[in-house]
């Protein structure tokens, strides 16, 4: 178990590497991070999903987005990762899963920025 300072350092380094497009390094640091804060934990898991998606490790990306959704149910991060999961599912031709994530987003967070234009994705995934 890491100290709180070490955890924040791992998170910060992981996010920095993610923004530098150094995805393997981002994954290494974010995997060392253990959150005591629910929101930060969700953001770290979501960032892992982004890194895995960039590396085309789509199964790991989806698992990370689902972990982010489950980690902290809130109006800030949950809609973000529901939309990312829906888009990833659509991109990987899992249309029923894409539709499910998109519909959950629309039903649970209708006023979130991520819900804007979500009907388009639901329509595409329904074909």
Where are the model-predicted features located?
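Short solvent-exposed coil/turn linkers within tandem alpha-helical repeat scaffolds
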Residues: 1-6, 20, 34-42, 70-77, ...
